[in-house]
Amino acid sequence: MSALGVTVALLVWAAFLLLVSMWRQVHSSWNLPPGPFPLPIIGNLFQLELKNIPKSFTRLAQRFGPVFTLYVGSQRMVVMHGYKAVKEALLDYKDEFSGRGDLPAFHAHRDRGIIFNNGPTWKDIRRFSLTTLRNYGMGKQGNESRIQREAHFLLEALRKTQGQPFDPTFLIGCAPCNVIADILFRKHFDYNDEKFLRLMYLFNENFHLLSTPWLQLYNNFPSFLHYLPGSHRKVIKNVAEVKEYVSERVKEHHQSLDPNCPRDLTDCLLVEMEKEKHSAERLYTMDGITVTVADLFFAGTETTSTTLRYGLLILMKYPEIEEKLHEEIDRVIGPSRIPAIKDRQEMPYMDAVVHEIQRFITLVPSNLPHEATRDTIFRGYLIPKGTVVVPTLDSVLYDNQEFPDPEKFKPEHFLNENGKFKYSDYFKPFSTGKRVCAGEGLARMELFLLLCAILQHFNLKPLVDPKDIDLSPIHIGFGCIPPRYKLCVIPRS
């Protein structure tokens, strides 16, 4: 090697050491929770398994404790792992950690709506949206009748399969999508409607893509990856297409709005906008309402749809559990009466199975990212304002003290020694605190009523031997994505 080459190599090495030294000084300048040492530019990327980030969090928690610091690129994040740390962060520090961490794939919704909003409007918009949802029957009789009506359409669609194999992805998804569409737009779609199926495809594809390694990488290195080809472009395009559809519906509602007789949640939001028409500072705008409605449309469709689809796969894996459910349904409801929420009190096994499905699949394992809204002392550590806070829900739902053998699907996790339903404070699939899922009440009702209705009328028939059914998710990231499968539903005599 020439003298020039040696000199250049030494200069590069010296520059690298200088960067490491500067990074170490910055990293140690705060009393942060412990964590692995971050490298310049990439941070702790090598400590994360992008195909299964929750698994990486568990491994790091075993090494550094229930509260630890990571850097992904230059982004600092503090991970809360385990029931005590997660509950403390989300409830005792609900204001300090109520911000929303940045998700670049959803920048079209940034600082608007109720899910991805980290701006000054989210609290007021969320509060009004929740109040309006409750007034329209969230968790009460109004939504019960909505779901019961939709169960009728779902059962008719299932009968039309005539016992032949089908992919349940969109057929099952039609029911929760129609329920939320009725709340938002007072609209019911035919199960073969092309626009309806297109919307569900967009929701499903985005939930799938957001859970892939590339999107995990993109959401942490957007400035480097934004202009490269990749699936992030598809997600951004899909978000824009859904937003355009919702925008058209909002404009139609605005043109026919009667402020004295709101028809649905969209109308209620528009009425609030009209009240602010002459205000200098406006909380409600057409674009903001569009994003709020799009947020609710996506969340109200995909999460319940995926949970139901995963639940049917689990029940085919364990036919003895399905048989117990049939027995309980026959005893409490009978063959023809429509399932009702009041039945839940007399159906502890069904209630336990619905809870165990949600616990077992941990649909959103690492929660949506939170953000520290101010400098905060947490367990003696300083968590600076702007730090991303990750309360890991899977670490609570898979706690092996509360749920022995958490890797196994066991409805007994939610049953006492007398076979009665047993509540667990560790059951947090919807998160908790100020960012708890806005549709928790609706989702819980849908899961119980729709699963009851399906099993009241049909036996589930897998295309393979139950012991060969693989329940492992195909992707674990933003969500846990179940494998694609087909099944047959056989009418019960």
UniProtKB/Swiss-Prot annotation:
Coiled coil: none annotated. Its EC number is 1.14.14.1, 1.14.13.n7. Pathway: Lipid metabolism; fatty acid metabolism. Its cofactor is heme. Changing residue 76 to H: In allele CYP2E1*2; reduced activity. It is a peripheral membrane protein. It is found in: Endoplasmic reticulum membrane; Microsome membrane; Mitochondrion inner membrane. It comes from the Eukaryota. One of its GO terms (molecular function) is enzyme binding. GO terms for cellular component: cytoplasm; endoplasmic reticulum membrane; intracellular membrane-bounded organelle; mitochondrial inner membrane. The omega-1 hydroxylase activity is stimulated by cytochrome b5. Changing residue 179 to I: In allele CYP2E1*4. It catalyses: an organic molecule + reduced [NADPH--hemoprotein reductase] + O2 = an alcohol + oxidized [NADPH--hemoprotein reductase] + H2O + H(+); (5Z,8Z,11Z)-eicosatrienoate + reduced [NADPH--hemoprotein reductase] + O2 = 19-hydroxy-(5Z,8Z,11Z)-eicosatrienoate + oxidized [NADPH--hemoprotein reductase] + H2O + H(+); (5Z,8Z,11Z,14Z,17Z)-eicosapentaenoate + reduced [NADPH--hemoprotein reductase] + O2 = 19-hydroxy-(5Z,8Z,11Z,14Z,17Z)-eicosapentaenoate + oxidized [NADPH--hemoprotein reductase] + H2O + H(+); (4Z,7Z,10Z,13Z,16Z,19Z)-docosahexaenoate + reduced [NADPH--hemoprotein reductase] + O2 = 21-hydroxy-(4Z,7Z,10Z,13Z,16Z,19Z)-docosahexaenoate + oxidized [NADPH--hemoprotein reductase] + H2O + H(+). Substrate binds at residues 298-303. Induction: By ethanol and isoniazid. It holds the Pfam family p450. GO terms for biological process: 4-nitrophenol metabolic process; benzene metabolic process; carbon tetrachloride metabolic process; epoxygenase P450 pathway; halogenated hydrocarbon metabolic process; lipid hydroxylation; long-chain fatty acid biosynthetic process; long-chain fatty acid metabolic process. Disulfide bonds: none annotated. A cytochrome P450 monooxygenase involved in the metabolism of fatty acids. Mechanistically, uses molecular oxygen inserting one oxygen atom into a substrate, and reducing the second into a water molecule, with two electrons provided by NADPH via cytochrome P450 reductase (NADPH--hemoprotein reductase). Catalyzes the hydroxylation of carbon-hydrogen bonds. Hydroxylates fatty acids specifically at the omega-1 position displaying the highest catalytic activity for saturated fatty acids. May be involved in the oxidative metabolism of xenobiotics. Interacts with chaperones HSP70 and HSP90; this interaction is required for initial targeting to mitochondria. Belongs to the cytochrome P450 family. This is Cytochrome P450 2E1. It comes from Homo sapiens.
